[in-house]
C-alpha cells in the first residue's frame, strides 16, 4: 500500500505553509530583539553621559576613550574637569562605540554610527547628538522610529 500523489502534494503543501509561517515569525522575533538592543543602547548612553558629568564634578580629570574607528578601539585619554555638560556629553557619545555596537549592522568598522549634527540619524542603530542653545539633544533611530532625549540647560545634572 502506497501514498497517492494527492496525499503527497497535500503533505508538501502543509510543510510549505508551516515553513512560511515560521520564517515570518522568526523575522518578527529578530526585528523585536534588534529594537530592544537599540533602545537599551540609548538608555546606556544616557546613563554614561550623566555618570561622566558627575565624575567630572568631583575629579580634576576623567578617563575617556577616543572614538572607535577602523575596527580599532579608541585610546584612553584624560578629559580635564570641570567641563560644560555639552562637552562631556559630546565626548561620551563619541566614545560610545567602544561600549556598544549597532544591532542592525554588527560588522561596522566603527561599531555604531555616531554623527554630530542637528538632524535625525539616517540609519537604524545610529546616533545623532548636538549641543543646542536650549540644551544637549540626543537622537537614536530604532526600527525606523527616532527616539529623542534632550537635557535642557536648566536641568543639566
Locate the predicted segments by residue:
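N-terminal single-pass transmembrane signal-anchor helix
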Residues: 1-27
Amino acid at each position: 500500500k502506497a501514498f497517492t500523489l494527492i496525499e503527497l502534494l497535500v503533505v508538501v503543501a502543509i510543510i510549505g505553509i508551516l515553513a512560511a509561517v515560521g520564517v515570518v515569525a522568526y523575522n518578527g522575533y529578530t526585528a523585536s530583539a534588534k529594537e530592544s538592543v537599540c533602545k537599551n543602547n540609548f538608555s546606556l548612553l544616557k546613563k554614561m553621559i550623566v555618570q561622566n558629568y558627575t565624575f567630572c564634578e568631583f575629579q580634576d580629570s576623567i578617563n575617556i576613550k577616543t572614538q572607535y574607528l577602523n575596527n580599532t578601539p579608541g585610546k584612553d585619554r584624560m578629559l580635564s574637569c570641570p567641563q560644560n555638560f555639552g562637552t562631556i556629553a559630546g565626548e561620551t557619545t563619541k566614545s560610545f562605540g567602544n561600549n556598544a555596537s549597532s544591532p542592525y549592522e554588527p560588522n561596522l568598522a566603527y561599531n555604531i554610527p555616531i554623527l554630530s549634527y542637528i538632524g535625525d540619524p539616517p540609519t537604524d542603530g545610529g546616533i545623532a547628538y548636538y549641543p543646542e542653545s536650549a540644551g544637549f539633544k540626543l537622537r537614536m533611530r530604532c526600527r525606523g522610529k527616532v527616539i529623542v532625549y534632550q537635557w535642557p540647560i536648566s536641568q543639566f545634572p
